[in-house]
Amino acid sequence: MRTLVRNAVAALLVFGLAGAASFAQSGEALYKSKCQMCHGEKGMADSGAGKAMKVKPVTDPEVKKMTEAQMIDAVHNGMGKMQAYKDKLSDAQIKEVVGYFRTFVK
């Protein structure tokens, strides 16, 4: 019985950690496919489209002070020239991509 419980706990830990890793990978993949064309590879808005639309980089004070909730709202409903993604991404996907984007904000 102890072996069964130990194996079950080990499986939960392994699959739980794998789930966390896939969450990060999913946010990165979504960012690359939906956001990078304007926000740039690392959020610096250094792409052609980002420069043309005058997207603010993650180093901009306005971007740096945004909370996670504000970023989620911006992706969900759009902001300035950025389109809304509420009909293109699920709430979970929006949270994942914002989580990934926030890794650039220092």
Describe the role of every protein-language-model region.
Residues M1-A24, A74, Y100-K106:
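Post-cleavage N-terminal segment of exported redox proteins
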Residues R2, E28-L30, D91, V98:
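General helical secondary-structure elements
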Residues L4, M44, G48, T67-Q70:
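N-proximal short alpha-helices
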Residues F15-L30, D46, P61-K64:
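Electrostatic cytochrome c docking/interface patches
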Residues A21, K32-C35, L89:
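A composition/secondary-structure signal for short, hydrophobic, low-basic-content segments
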